[in-house]
From Swiss-Prot:
Keyword Transcription: no
Main location: cytoplasm
Record function comment: The RuvA-RuvB-RuvC complex processes Holliday junction (HJ) DNA during genetic recombination and DNA repair, while the RuvA-RuvB complex plays an important role in the rescue of blocked DNA replication forks via replication fork reversal (RFR). RuvA specifically binds to HJ cruciform DNA, conferring on it an open structure. The RuvB hexamer acts as an ATP-dependent pump, pulling dsDNA into and through the RuvAB complex. HJ branch migration allows RuvC to scan DNA until it finds its consensus sequence, where it cleaves and resolves the cruciform DNA.
Keywords on record: Cytoplasm, DNA damage, DNA recombination, DNA repair, DNA-binding
This protein's record includes keyword DNA repair: yes
Name listed for the protein in its UniProt record: Holliday junction branch migration complex subunit RuvA
InterPro entries in the record: DNA_helicase_Holl-junc_RuvA_I, NA-bd_OB-fold, RuvA, RuvA_2-like, RuvA_C, RuvA_C_sf
One Gene Ontology molecular-function label: four-way junction DNA binding
Source domain of life: Bacteria
GO cellular component: cytoplasm; Holliday junction helicase complex; Holliday junction resolvase complex
Self-association and partners: Homotetramer. Forms an RuvA(8)-RuvB(12)-Holliday junction (HJ) complex. HJ DNA is sandwiched between 2 RuvA tetramers; dsDNA enters through RuvA and exits via RuvB. An RuvB hexamer assembles on each DNA strand where it exits the tetramer. Each RuvB hexamer is contacted by two RuvA subunits (via domain III) on 2 adjacent RuvB subunits; this complex drives branch migration. In the full resolvosome a probable DNA-RuvA(4)-RuvB(12)-RuvC(2) complex forms which resolves the HJ.
Start and end residues of each stretch annotated as Domain III: 155-202
GO biological process, one term: DNA repair
């Protein structure tokens, strides 16, 4: 399963972009609207945490700037009647912390601002979110690309490496070395540095 993609931005079309890795492989990645608006010019470097959606006729990659956003997308698409396109539309309108606040504040109608979601569907989604979203993380659900407490950086980067197939012992050892040398790294930076170190060691 593809969980992380990093490379050069080759093309943007609609709500998707094409990322060409350093190995020359190009991936079409669908991203939320706010991420689309912040993409660099063609040729710039981009990186995404990936959720892979497999259908009978297609394999689609959905990319997110933070691990929290990716995990929220997975929660959303686990809800009946919420497909990948709807999940992406919701995350184009609301960040993960916004969704948690909606749950805490019991603001069902806010979801109807998302195109294609009526009141009945919003109520259904909201009911599921109450049980599936980690509202106890509010207000400090730190995004992977903006840093946070060192322990949180280590924990989230370790989870990212585990999802890429690395063993906990190996990944933990490399991450500790990385963060010892560069303690101010955010999660995205720590993950990239660890991946480079792991690649050199193999």
């Amino acid at each position: 399963m593809i969980a992380y993609v990093e490379g050069r931005l080759a093309e943007v079309a609609g709500n998707a972009c094409v990322v060409v890795t350093d190995g020359g492989v190009g991936y079409e990645v669908f991203v939320p609207g706010h991420t689309l608006a912040r993409l660099p010019d063609k040729g710039g470097r981009v990186s995404f945490f990936i959720s892979t959606e497999v259908r009978e006729d297609a394999l689609e990659l959905y990319g997110f700037a933070t691990w929290d956003e990716r995990q929220t997308f997975i929660v959303l698409t686990s809800i009946s009647k919420v497909g990948a396109k709807t999940g992406l539309a919701i995350l184009s309108q609301f960040r993960p912390d916004d969704l948690r606040r909606l749950v805490v504040e019991d603001d069902v109608l806010a979801l109807t601002r998302v195109s294609g979601i009526g009141k009945k569907t919003a109520q259904h989604i909201f009911l599921e979110l109450k049980y599936k979203l980690k509202v106890e993380d509010l207000p400090a659900a730190a995004p992977l690309v903006t840093g946070g407490a060192p322990g949180g950086v280590f924990r989230d980067a370790l989870a990212g490496l585990a999802n890429l197939g690395y063993g906990e012992e190996e990944a933990s050892h490399v991450l500790k070395d990385v963060l010892h040398g560069e303690p101010d790294l955010d999660v995205g930076g720590a993950l990239r540095a660890a991946l480079r170190a792991l690649a050199r060691g193999r």
